[in-house]
Amino acid sequence: MNNATGSVWVVITNLRVVRGNPDRLQSETRSAFVAQTPELLIHDADGNLVRDGRWMYSWDAENRLTRVMSVAGPLSSFRRVEWKYDAWGRRTRQTSYVLSNGVWQVVEDVKFVSDPVFFGRHVAELNATNNSLVRSYVWGLDLSGTLDGAGGVGGLLWLTINSGPSAGTHFVCYDGNGNVWTLVSATTGTESARYEYGPFGEPLRLSGPAARSNPFRFSTKRAEDFTALVLYEYRAYSPTSGRWLSRDPVGERSFKELLRSQRGGAVLDEVAFCRNDAVRHYDVLGLAWDVVKCQSWCDEVVRYCNFWSRKRALEWCYTCCLDAMEDKAQGKACVVATATACLCVRKPPWKRK
């Protein structure tokens, strides 16, 4: 493969062998896009990504992503996706196109119906042409044990798909971080979809008849298949690069964190996803990352163990929160999060008998 002079499409064939008598073989061939090296990333004056090795990005005056369009590869692979927003900044419409014989053809055009209370949480999707129902969603308590404490992560209870081979209601199952793991058909009780992710949310495998029909996957956020973006409420995230496409909209928080990281000898990138450490940091809305910790425990560590530094206390908290997923001892409840969130209950060591 030579991508020094331009981007290339690489054909990849996966072969699966199950030993037996006879052996069972299954192969699948796909193509993967590889950008030119070095890849040039172009940003506008507001820090929004406007072009990379494959896509061109358009933004409105409020720094909201309005269009993503292919700029590299064979014409048959060109895609375009557009979004519209309401006065509150919620996405209200998504239109997807493919390039066919030099003409952009609409392949999907849906309107989003959002919950009036919880920002950006979709409860239904309508066909933009005739307003017929495409999908509907039922939400409950998220991983914080409340309706919105974790930004809806792990809060989708079931979805109903109105047409196609996977039509029907599907219950949602999660992994420990609130990522959608499997779907179970409410009619047959069998698994209808399964998802596997990399450490930064990149999709490793999607299987089952309903896998593509369900847009809510990593962090229970909407995924867009053409561009491989994850659409958080306030920003778009690219799992393939592990970066946001725009700067943190909470400028004051970003500036404070930038100063803090510089004092500690590190440089914080405002578009890096969870400080490039999605195991010990999380971001539920696309606003600002936070540290995986139980603040009340950290405060108690400092209060009861004055000889520990604050840094040592936080390091202990990282460990205790991770251990708590396996140690379900009775004690003070607290919500902690990784790239999304997880619920754990544990006593600090100085309160254990």
Q: Which role does the model predict for each range below?
A:
Residues 202-206, 235-245, 249-295:
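Short, low-complexity export/processing leader segments characterized by acidic and small residues
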Residues 14, 45, 50-55, 61, ...:
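Beta-turn initiation residues at beta-strand->coil junctions
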Residues 293-346:
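Secreted, short cysteine-rich peptides and small extracellular cysteine-rich domains stabilized by multiple disulfide
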Residues 40, 133, 137-151, 157-234, ...:
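A motif-centric feature for acidic-aromatic and gly/ser/thr-rich catalytic loops and repeats
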Residues 73, 101-104, 261-263:
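Short consensus segments that form the blades of beta-propeller domains
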Residues 2-17, 31-33, 38-46, 55-64, ...:
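Aromatic-rich beta-strand edge motifs centered on tyrosine
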Residues 26, 50, 66, 92, ...:
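Generic structural signal for well-ordered beta-strand positions
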Residues 18-27:
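Short, exposed coil/turn segments at beta-strand boundaries within extracellular/luminal domains
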